[in-house]
Regions:
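Hydrophobic anchor at the beta1->P-loop junction of P-loop NTPases
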Residues: 6
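P-loop (Walker A) phosphate-binding loop of NTP-binding proteins
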Residues: 9
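Conserved glycine(s) of the Walker
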Residues: 13
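NTP-dependent small-molecule kinase module
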Residues: 16, 20, 24, 134-164
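Post-Walker A helix-loop "phosphate-sensing" segment adjacent to the P-loop in P-loop NTPases
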Residues: 23-34
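ATP-dependent small-molecule kinase phosphotransfer cores
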Residues: 34-88
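Short glycine-rich anion-binding loops that position phosphate/pyrophosphate groups of nucleotides
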Residues: 78-80, 102-104, 150
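A glycine- and Lys/Arg-enriched "phosphate-lid" helix/loop adjacent to the NTP-binding pocket
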Residues: 93-135
Length: 164
């Protein structure tokens, strides 16, 4: 299987690593968050504010279920793991890699990138989301990588698994 889908929290490095891997392998890359934004003509944050968190999740599922093996390197939104249908679908044509980045690092990155769209239900904090999703990331991933490694080390680790 030569396709890869990245899962993990927002700001864990999915898109950065995915783009770098795609570039190294000269393959295409797609970010499901960007597909949702393109489809709706708004940022994730604007979509969430206008239509609500559940709408974002439903859009994410639709976008993922429309993907196929022609998409070689895929970065999913952090909440994709809430849809078992989405995860099963990705698993039919790609290796699912979880970038397990410590909460402290994620919090720092989110602080720096405040423009980042983060679909968080009303009343929940990032540590709550992290703790809720972590078992789901473990459940659906074939491979777990340490997200505290440098981008280059993460890319090297992914490349080791790409042709298995």
């Amino acid at each position: 299987m030569n396709n890869i889908s990245f899962i993990g929290m927002a700001a864990c490095g999915k898109s950065t690593v995915g783009k770098a891997v795609a570039e190294k392998l000269n393959e295409n890359f797609v970010d499901t968050d960007l597909l949702i934004e393109q489809k709706n003509g708004l940022s994730l944050e604007e979509i969430k504010n206008k239509y609500g968190y559940k709408f974002v999740r439903a859009e994410e599922e639709k976008v993922i279920l429309n993907l196929n093996s022609s998409y070689k390197i895929i970065s999913t939104g952090g909440s994709a793991v809430y849809s078992s249908k989405s995860m099963m679908h990705l698993g039919t044509f790609s290796k699912i890699i979880y970038i397990n980045t410590p909460l402290e690092i994620i919090m720092k990155r989110i602080e720096v990138e405040q423009k980042r769209g983060l679909a968080v239900p009303e009343g929940m904090l990032i540590p709550d989301i992290y703790n809720e999703r972590e078992p789901l990331y473990q459940k659906y991933s074939e491979i777990t990588l340490d997200g505290s490694m440098t981008i280059q080390k993460l890319v090297d680790e992914v490349l080791k698994h790409f042709h298995e």
